[in-house]
């Protein structure tokens, strides 16, 4: 009898019993009337008359009127008092439950070390990301982003070489730039060391040259001198200050991203917690690209 603990089930059971009783009552009344009553009353003027059978000018039965009135009253109660419009949705309930779970999840795992974060991120990657990016995260021969290189200098070099479909920024798609590998590496070194919050590069000797190229090759035209991609307080291009960080990854997970093959959908519906996004970012950063 656990189902009686839910007031909706109780309400439905009572309503079903009421309907059953009324049905039995009305059915018995009609059967009795059909058996005992005689034709009487006035026929409607200009009413239907078929084979000598006419249509009486009777009033609407009391039972019908009562049914109509009860239905109207019930509908009014249902929409304005019982379950007001927009007061509840299954999606909203799901989101609230996930939010509560994420709070417990983060409280439980808030003191994870670096290795544990990477392990957690690997688990998230294998469940949600490996189908497109591959078990090795190398992008399945170009069908998806190579995450071994993404978020690092190698990822910037790939973007310079091949361009980027982007994330529906006002600047549109970024075209490929005609730069040799050395110049691309210099720009990547400058971005990772001076613009990105990562503040780290494997080639510190190329930072100054990278800055010159970043300004002279037109990168500032879209990304701005500070790399934030803002123009007139609008997001015009990718924010390079967040490149390689969990904030950049969170933006992609929230909005999705165009690719050369297909389109990465938004993962906003997954309701990843901040800790899960951080763990996934740590895992991606732990992947070591091969030297070109």
Swiss-Prot record:
Keywords: Cell inner membrane, Cell membrane, Electron transport, Heme, Hydrogen ion transport, Ion transport, Iron, Membrane, Metal-binding, Oxidoreductase, Repeat, Respiratory chain, Transmembrane, Transmembrane helix, Transport. Pfam families: Cytochrome_CBB3, FixP_N. One of its GO terms (biological process) is proton transmembrane transport. GO terms for molecular function: electron transfer activity; heme binding; metal ion binding; oxidoreductase activity. Pathway: Energy metabolism; oxidative phosphorylation. The chain crosses the membrane at residues 11-31, 62-82. It is a multi-pass membrane protein. Heme c 1 binds at residues 129, 132-133, 264. Residues 116-195, 205-288 form the Cytochrome c domain. GO terms for cellular component: plasma membrane. Its cofactor is heme c. Belongs to the CcoP / FixP family. Component of the cbb3-type cytochrome c oxidase at least composed of CcoN, CcoO, CcoQ and CcoP. This is Cbb3-type cytochrome c oxidase subunit CcoP. It comes from Helicobacter pylori (strain 52).
């Amino acid at each position: 009898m656990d189902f009686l603990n839910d007031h909706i089930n109780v309400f439905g059971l009572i309503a079903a019993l009421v309907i059953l009783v009324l049905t039995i009552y009305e059915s018995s009344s009609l059967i009795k009337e059909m058996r005992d009553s005689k034709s009487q009353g006035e026929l409607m003027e200009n009413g239907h008359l078929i084979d000598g059978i006419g249509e009486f000018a009777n009033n609407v039965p009391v039972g019908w009127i009562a049914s109509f009135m009860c239905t109207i009253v019930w509908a009014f109660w249902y929409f304005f008092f019982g379950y007001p419009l927009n007061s509840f949705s299954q999606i909203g309930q799901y989101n609230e439950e996930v939010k509560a779970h994420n709070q417990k999840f983060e409280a439980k795992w808030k003191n994870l070390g670096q290795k544990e974060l990477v392990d957690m991120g690997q688990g998230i990657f294998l469940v949600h990301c490996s189908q497109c990016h591959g078990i090795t995260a190398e992008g399945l021969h170009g069908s998806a982003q190579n995450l071994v290189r993404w978020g690092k200098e190698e990822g910037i070099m790939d973007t310079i070489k091949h361009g980027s479909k982007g994330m529906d920024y006002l600047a549109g798609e970024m075209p490929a730039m005609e730069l040799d590998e050395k110049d691309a590496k210099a720009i990547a070194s400058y971005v990772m060391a001076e613009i990105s919050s990562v503040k780290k590069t494997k080639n510190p000797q190329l930072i100054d040259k990278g800055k010159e190229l970043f300004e002279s090759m037109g990168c500032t035209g879209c990304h701005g001198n500070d790399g934030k991609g803002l123009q007139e307080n609008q997001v015009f291009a990718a924010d390079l200050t967040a490149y390689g960080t969990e904030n950049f990854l969170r933006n992609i997970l929230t909005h999705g991203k165009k690719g050369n093959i297909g389109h990465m959908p938004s993962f906003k519906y997954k309701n990843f917690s901040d800790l899960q996004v951080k763990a996934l970012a740590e895992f991606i950063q732990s992947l070591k690209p091969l030297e070109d």
